[in-house]
A protein has these predicted regions:
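Rossmann-like dinucleotide-binding domain that binds NAD(P)(H)
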Residues: 70-132
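Glycine-rich phosphate-binding loop at the start of an alpha helix
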Residues: 6, 29, 158
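Rossmann-fold NAD(P) dinucleotide-binding segment
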Residues: 2-21
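A general structural signal for well-ordered alpha-helical segments in protein cores
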Residues: 57, 88-89, 158-162
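Short beta->alpha connector loops
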Residues: 2-3, 25-26, 51-53, 108-109, ...
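A contiguous active-site-proximal alpha/beta segment in oxidoreductase catalytic domains
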Residues: 20, 25-85
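NAD(P)-dinucleotide binding in Rossmann-like oxidoreductases
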Residues: 105-170
Length: 170
C-alpha cells in the first residue's frame, strides 16, 4: 500500500540499499516528493507492475503492424484505481511510450473510469471497480483490433523479478 512505503523504505534507502517496491509506489504528492528527493540524492529503487511483462502482450510491444496505428485502448481492471490502476497503465506504456497529455476521471470511488489521451492521438479508457473482471487489453487500430488477456501471472511476476535482479547486477 502506497501510503506506507515512505516509512517502510526510509531505513533501507537512506542506508544505501537498493530496493524493489511493490505498487503503488505512493498515494500522495507529499510521498512522491520524498521518493523524488531520494532518487535525486542517488537512492536506487525500482517499482513496476508485473502486467508490463505478460507474455501475451509481448508480441504487440515489439510490433503491432496488423492493427495499424493504435487509436483506442481499453484496459479494464478489478479493484480500485488507486491501487490497481498502475497495472493498466504499465501494460499499455510499452505500446504507446511517453506522451500522455491529459487524464480525466469520471465515475465514482467504487466504479472509476479514467479517460487518458496520448500525444500520438490514441485514446485510452481504464474502467475499474470492485468485482469487475479485468487483466486484459482491447486494442483498436486503423487496420484491425484485438483483445488480449494476461493468463500466465507466474511468467509475468518471474520476469519482473528476473529483470530486477539483472538491474541489481548491472
Amino acid at each position: 500500500v502506497g501510503h506506507e512505503h515512505v516509512e517502510r523504505c526510509r531505513p533501507f534507502l537512506e542506508a544505501g540499499l537498493p530496493m524493489f517496491i511493490d505498487k503503488p509506489l505512493v498515494n500522495s504528492e507529499e510521498d512522491l516528493r520524498t521518493f523524488v528527493k531520494w532518487h535525486d540524492d542517488g537512492a536506487q529503487f525500482l517499482t513496476s507492475s508485473s502486467m508490463r511483462y505478460c507474455k501475451e502482450y509481448e508480441p504487440y510491444y515489439a510490433n503491432h503492424y496488423e492493427l495499424g496505428e493504435l487509436m483506442y485502448i481499453c484496459s479494464p481492471m478489478s479493484k480500485k484505481y488507486e491501487t490497481y490502476g498502475i497495472h493498466a497503465l504499465e501494460s499499455m506504456y510499452p505500446l504507446l511510450g511517453p506522451g500522455f497529455v491529459s487524464v480525466q476521471s469520471t465515475g465514482t470511488y467504487e466504479r472509476s473510469m479514467m479517460h487518458i489521451l496520448h500525444e500520438g492521438g490514441c485514446a485510452v479508457d481504464i474502467p475499474q471497480g470492485i468485482g469487475m473482471a479485468g487483466a486484459g487489453i482491447l486494442m483498436i487500430g486503423s487496420k484491425g483490433s484485438n483483445y488480449i488477456q494476461c493468463r500466465d501471472s507466474y511468467y509475468a511476476f518471474k520476469k519482473q523479478l528476473d529483470l530486477f535482479v539483472h538491474w541489481l547486477r548491472t
